[in-house]
Amino acid sequence: MKVIKGLTAGLIFLFLCACGGQQIKDPLNYEVEPFTFQNQDGKNVSLESLKGEVWLADFIFTNCETICPPMTAHMTDLQKKLKAENIDVRIISFSVDPENDKPKQLKKFAANYPLSFDNWDFLTGYSQSEIEEFALKSFKAIVKKPEGEDQVIHQSSFYLVGPDGKVLKDYNGVENTPYDDIISDVKSASTLK
């Protein structure tokens, strides 16, 4: 009788683990601040409009001479890999140079990459101080445009945001981007919907 109870308990445990999917290991759980910004087509994108969706975020700018081109290339590769696996995820690129990055400029920048706007929005429509504060509060990310400079200091991470608007993980977006880990975590986050 004890053996049957033990086996039953073990089977129930295995069943629950299999049904629950994988968990995000050590989630960051940063709360994304409410926002409403403009995308490359001049349309509003907000935290509210992303509610219930899993999304990836990064910080870039169109005049970037260093890390933004490889970051955008890697995010483009990631977009293709996610689409190949039929994984539903949005991509949000926040401009860290909003004074220069108007919607038209963002669209022109994106045209340099074989990406799709189907699920990718490049955002602007805020002041420099607003994006610096938003990045710090929401993503614990530093964004700073030194006075008199045309380059902006910013994080090079990709961020996974869950359907509840919390940042779950961050990943290197420049070197050795962990595509398989990101895809696995996106799948896990999708079970939280």
UniProtKB/Swiss-Prot annotation:
Transmembrane segments: none annotated. Keywords: Cell membrane, Chaperone, Copper, Lipoprotein, Membrane, Metal-binding, Palmitate, Signal. It is a lipid-anchor. Changing residue 154 to A: Abolishes cytochrome c oxidase assembly. Residues 1-18 form the signal peptide. It is found in: Cell membrane. GO terms for molecular function: metal ion binding. A lipid is attached at residue 19 (N-palmitoyl cysteine). PROSITE patterns: THIOREDOXIN_2 (PS51352). One of its GO terms (cellular component) is plasma membrane. Changing residue 68 to S: Abolishes cytochrome c oxidase assembly. InterPro entries: SCO1/SenC (IPR003782), Thioredoxin-like_sf (IPR036249), Thioredoxin_domain (IPR013766). A lipid is attached at residue 19 (S-diacylglycerol cysteine). Cu cation binds at residues 64, 68, 154. Residues 26-191 form the Thioredoxin domain. Monomer. Belongs to the SCO1/2 family. Necessary for insertion of copper into the active site of cytochrome c oxidase. May play a role in copper homeostasis or redox signaling. This is SCO1 protein homolog. The lineage of its organism: Bacteria, Bacillati, Bacillota, Bacilli, Bacillales.
